[in-house]
Structures are given as C-alpha cells and as structure tokens.
Amino acid sequence: MSVSLIVMGAAGRMGSILARLISEAPDLTLAAVLESPGHVDKLNAWEAGGTRVETDPAVAMTALPGAVVVDFTAPEATMSTARLAAAHGNPMVIGTTGLTDGNKAELSELAKRVPLFLSPNMSVGVNVLLEVLPEL
C-alpha cells in the first residue's frame, strides 16, 4: 500500500529534496507539491510528470483526503497549513525551524485532532549523532 504525500514548499531546499526522494520511493506517492504563487513556476517539471501542483493547501487537502502533509517551510506558513490539515483530517510531518513556544502549544492542541509529527531538526548529521551518542 502506497502512502500519498503532499510536500509544502517544494521549490525550497528541503522541499525539493523531499519531493525527489518521495517520487523515487516505491511505497510512497508524491500526490502534490505546493509553493507560493511567486515560486510555482519552479515546479513545472513536477506538473509535467503528472504530480499535482498547487498554490493553495486547502485545495490540495480537499482533493487528497488523508494524504500526509510534509512541511519544511517558514513558521507562519507551517502554522496556517497545520490548522488546515487539522480541519481537513490530513496527518502532518513538520520539520520547520523557528517555531515559538506558542506555536508548539498550538500544534499540541491540533495533534489531538490529527496525527502530527514535529521535529525541527532533521538534518542527517544531528540524527546520526543522536543515534551514536548512547553507544559512546
């Protein structure tokens, strides 16, 4: 069974890497890529390949119920997307840095309505270090 994913900020550094890796994974489906209207032209290759390209997260979530939203954007965009995801019932993975304590408290409340995974530091080096530290 394939998991459908929606990648927010797909023209950005992390978003573009994630979109590529998801598209190459046999058990994942890149259902949609999103970007702000000023940057959506950078996603033409995805659209040509058959992936849905959107500028409005609500449109993507309505069209793709249950798809997991992956967000590595900016705090304000992440919070807006998280509210929409909770309202539409889309699970969410958040890797955005710079979230305030207030943002995190709101995300905790939203997580009562929809599965939500938050890890603002998903860099390979940090995760390898965290894995190795207990063995030292």
Report the location of each language-model feature.
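Glycine-rich, highly charged phosphate/nucleotide-binding loops
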Residues: 46-64, 70-78
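Residues in the short beta-alpha loop(s) of Rossmann-like NAD(P)-binding domains
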Residues: 11, 34-37, 98
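NAD(P)-binding Rossmann-fold cofactor-contacting core
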Residues: 21-47
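N-terminal Rossmann NAD(P)H-binding glycine-rich loop of SDR-like oxidoreductase domains
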Residues: 8-20
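Extreme N-terminal starter segment of soluble prokaryotic enzymes
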Residues: 2-6
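Hydrophobic beta-strand scaffold residues
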Residues: 30, 53, 92-93, 116-118
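Rossmann-fold NAD(P)-binding glycine/threonine-rich loop
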Residues: 76-88, 95-119, 124-136
